[in-house]
């Protein structure tokens, strides 16, 4: 009797075990189909099927790090001053901001990097041809910035940009507009190399270009058949581009191989990257604050091996740009080669000293954190692709290229041949929107009509009035070149009260010409975007797409 009872119990125990195993098998089989990345969660259809249908890069892992870049993991930080405002500018009052993760150049753009840009322009758009002469000329740095009435600096005028001795020194004499155009060129050259590497373009395609057949990332993504002036469907196409039945295959945004644009960093990004607060983080709190990009309240190194040496290249005192012969404090009189000093905690070099750097923002004395405390940036001008009479996107050609004349008379190309023409967004994009209402937002809430003391109601926004008396920032407005003084004229009005307008840009950081006060990352200065100097350079940034970091692990310390 006992034996039969035990046998029955054992049999009953087997039933749920078998049912459980069966359930696991069913879940496993069913889970495979439900969790398959090549099966649509919306329709159940197969993705990337040989028969056709929806095609998507389901194997995408992570954004590729572009040449020269370092990943900066985003976060929150106090943007603004952390020391006494001895200059009494009151233009960097502390405000809490958050920036997304992004990439930034490890170093400033060097003379060698910029010379590569000039070489490409000269080969593709020969300056000896009348229609192209202003493309190359407009990109040339102003080497005369080294001149001073009471200084013997002609050696730098003649040699600094082109001599190989200065190859790894930061480029100077570049205005804000030129820095933006270099960034656009760099974007296209990097993506062109990626497409060639991955077989979408011929290996030597990028070496066979001329003024009528250049590569543009924007053109390739939006109207790929017109890339290289239409030659992509012939000798410029790569192995992957030759699809079945003669159909061309192009990389798309969904392919995930093309990088976002190289651009100037925003002021918030630059300051966040320079401060590199991850160096003083423990768990989820900061242990103190940073005055400089390194972990010290002083400009000299406290490390045993380098104790007493300056941590950046800046002016030591009146008439002292580098110390005594044989015992240089900062290893240079003018600029020095990039990577001369140790990097900050993000791995970035020269975020203090050497040269100050252009950032993307239009200058205003106040950061309006009531409107934005996320990815703060003043300077948005929203554009869209121009559409021709045939309903197609307009590609700039050598015959349709347009030039802009800057306030100082310098002529620069607005867009290079091969790029898509753009126009400001209009009411078709802004109608009944609440997040933005205009294309040009540079003076939003600080310089537009609604922010002036003359504003009474919404009807004033469309009214006309004296631009001198109704403007919040009554800045000089030089006449467009073309009349007096050999094509140049000055604003001689005595009514002007400010140098601030929508074409004045922020530059950050100290330089070889500056005292230690300016190497604090929070300090801000500004100049008109057409001005170049011997102490301002730039570096590029790139937005990160996808996850905030490359790993999901939190670390106790930065």
Where are the predicted features?
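Sec-dependent N-terminal signal peptides
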Residues: 14-21, 31
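C-terminal motif of bacterial Sec signal peptides marking the signal peptidase cleavage site
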Residues: 26-28
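Short, P/G- and charge-enriched loop/turn segments at secondary-structure junctions
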Residues: 57-59, 89-92, 494, 524-529
């Amino acid at each position: 009797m006992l034996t039969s009872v035990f046998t029955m119990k054992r049999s009953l125990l087997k039933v749920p075990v078998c049912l459980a195993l069966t359930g696991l098998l069913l879940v496993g089989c069913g889970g495979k189909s439900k969790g398959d990345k090549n099966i649509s969660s919306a329709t159940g259809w197969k993705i990337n099927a040989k028969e056709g249908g929806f095609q998507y890069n389901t194997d995408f892992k992570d954004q590729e790090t572009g040449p020269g870049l370092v990943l900066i993991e985003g976060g929150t930080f106090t943007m603004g001053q952390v020391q006494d405002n001895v200059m009494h500018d009151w233009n960097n009052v502390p405000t809490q901001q958050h920036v997304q993760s992004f990439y930034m150049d490890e170093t400033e753009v060097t003379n060698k990097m910029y010379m590569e840009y000039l070489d490409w322009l000269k080969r593709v758009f020969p300056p000896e041809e009348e229609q192209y002469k202003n493309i190359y000329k407009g990109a040339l740095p102003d080497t005369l910035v080294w001149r001073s009435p009471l200084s013997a600096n002609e050696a730098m005028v003649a040699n600094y940009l082109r001599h190989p001795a200065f190859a790894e020194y930061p480029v100077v004499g570049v205005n804000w507009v030129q820095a933006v155009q270099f960034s656009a060129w760099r974007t296209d050259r990097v993506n062109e190399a990626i497409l060639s590497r991955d077989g979408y373009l011929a290996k030597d395609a990028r070496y066979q270009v001329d003024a009528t057949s250049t590569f543009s990332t924007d053109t390739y993504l939006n109207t790929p058949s017109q890339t290289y002036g239409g030659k992509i469907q012939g000798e410029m196409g790569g192995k992957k581009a030759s699809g079945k039945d003669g159909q061309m295959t192009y990389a798309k945004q969904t392919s995930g191989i093309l990088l976002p644009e190289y651009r100037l960093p925003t002021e918030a990004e630059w300051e966040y990257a320079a401060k590199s607060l991850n160096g003083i983080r423990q768990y989820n709190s900061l242990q103190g604050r940073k005055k400089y990009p390194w972990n010290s309240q002083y400009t000299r190194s406290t490390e045993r091996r380098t104790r007493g040496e300056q941590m950046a290249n800046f002016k030591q005192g009146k008439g002292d740009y580098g110390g005594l012969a044989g015992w240089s404090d900062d290893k240079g009189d003018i600029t020095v080669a990039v990577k001369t000093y140790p990097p900050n905690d993000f791995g970035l070099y020269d975020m203090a000293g050497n040269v100050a750097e252009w950032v993307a923002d239009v200058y205003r004395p106040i950061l309006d954190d009531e409107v934005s405390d996320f990815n703060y940036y003043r300077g948005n001008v929203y554009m869209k692709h121009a559409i021709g009479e045939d309903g197609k996107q307009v590609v700039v050609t050598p015959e349709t290229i347009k030039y802009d004349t800057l306030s100082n008379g310098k002529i620069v190309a607005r867009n290079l041949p091969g790029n898509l023409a753009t126009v400001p967004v209009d009411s078709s994009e802004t109608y009944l929107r609440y997040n933005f209402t205009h294309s040009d937002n540079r003076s939003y809430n600080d310089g537009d009509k609604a922010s002036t003391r003359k504003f009474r109601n919404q009807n004033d926004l469309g009214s006309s009035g004296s631009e001198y008396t109704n403007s919040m920032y009554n800045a000089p407005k030089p006449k467009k070149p073309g009349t007096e003084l050999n094509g140049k004229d000055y604003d001689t009005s005595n009514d002007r009260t400010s140098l601030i307008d929508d074409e004045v840009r922020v530059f950050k950081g100290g330089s070889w010409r500056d005292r230690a006060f300016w190497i604090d990352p929070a300090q801000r200065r500004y100049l008109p975007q057409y001005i170049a100097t011997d102490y301002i350079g730039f570096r590029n940034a790139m937005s990160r797409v996808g996850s905030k970091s490359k790993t999901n692990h939190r670390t106790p310390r930065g």
